[in-house]
Every structure is written in C-alpha cells, then in structure tokens.
Amino acid sequence: MIIFTITIIVMMLATILSKKTITDREKSSPFECGFDPMNYSRLPFSLRFFLIAIIFLIFDVEIALILPMILIIKTSNLMNWSMTSLFFIFILLIGLYHEWNQGALEWNN
C-alpha cells in the first residue's frame, strides 16, 4: 500500500512539473526557415498492409513459441507433449480461420 501511494505521488509530481506552457506549443510545429511547410509531412499508409503486418507478427510469435517444443520432447511424456502441441496448433488454426472468415486476409476490397 505504501509503494502504491509513493508511486501515485511521484506520478502526480511528474505531471505537475512537466506541464507545457502555451509558448512551448510552437516548438512542436513544423518549421522550414520561417515559411509554412510546402507539403504534408506524413505519407499515406495502407491500412490493409498494416493489418496484414499485425497478423503476420501475431502468427510469427506463435511459431516462435512452437519451436522450443521440439527440445521439450526429450524431457516430457510423449502423450502430454503431443496433446499440448495439437492444442497449440489447433488454436493457431482457429485464429487463422477467424481472420480468413472476417476477410482480413483479402487484399482487394
């Protein structure tokens, strides 16, 4: 409880001491030698590509979790290992089916 209280006090002090003033707002605006920017600084980004990249990262992490299971087979019971492996792969396939069913894997809309 004491640690929680100290943490809250430190967070409140940090918030109070780090408040930006109105004059600091100009520091975050784009500046090109005193002129307004000639073009928009952010490029458009495909939302479909972002979604595919996130799905790839999720499945990549799951595959990285499957790889150590090969080393575990030597030290564990074969039945427990096979049930765990099948359950994990089943969850992977359910996730893939869900993404496919929702249309997240289709590039053209």
Curated annotation (Swiss-Prot):
Instruction: List the protein's name.
Output: NADH-ubiquinone oxidoreductase chain 3
According to its UniProt entry, the function of this protein is described as: Core subunit of the mitochondrial membrane respiratory chain NADH dehydrogenase (Complex I) that is believed to belong to the minimal assembly required for catalysis. Complex I functions in the transfer of electrons from NADH to the respiratory chain. The immediate electron acceptor for the enzyme is believed to be ubiquinone.
* One Pfam family named in its UniProt record: Oxidored_q4
Q: What is its EC number?
A: 7.1.1.2
Q: Does the keyword Translocase apply?
A: yes
> What InterPro entries does this protein map onto?
NADH_UbQ/plastoQ_OxRdtase_su3, NDAH_ubi_oxred_su3_sf
UniProt lists the family membership as follows: Belongs to the complex I subunit 3 family.
Instruction: Enumerate the PANTHER family for this protein.
Output: NADH-UBIQUINONE OXIDOREDUCTASE CHAIN 3 (PTHR11058:SF9)
Q: Which GO terms describe its cellular component?
A: mitochondrial membrane; NADH dehydrogenase complex
Report if keyword Protein transport is assigned: no
The membrane topology term of the UniProt record is: Multi-pass membrane protein
The entry's localization annotation reads: Mitochondrion membrane
**Molecular function GO labels:** NADH dehydrogenase (ubiquinone) activity
Main site of residence?
Answer: mitochondrion
List the transmembrane segments. 2-22, 52-72, 78-98
What reaction gets catalysed by this protein?
a ubiquinone + NADH + 5 H(+)(in) = a ubiquinol + NAD(+) + 4 H(+)(out)
What is the annotated signal peptide range for this record? none
For the protein in the UniProt heading, the enzyme class is: translocase
- Source organism (scientific name): Aedes aegypti
Q: Which domain of life is it from?
A: Eukaryota
Which keywords does this chain's UniProt record carry? Electron transport, Membrane, Mitochondrion, NAD, Respiratory chain, Translocase, Transmembrane, Transmembrane helix, Transport, Ubiquinone
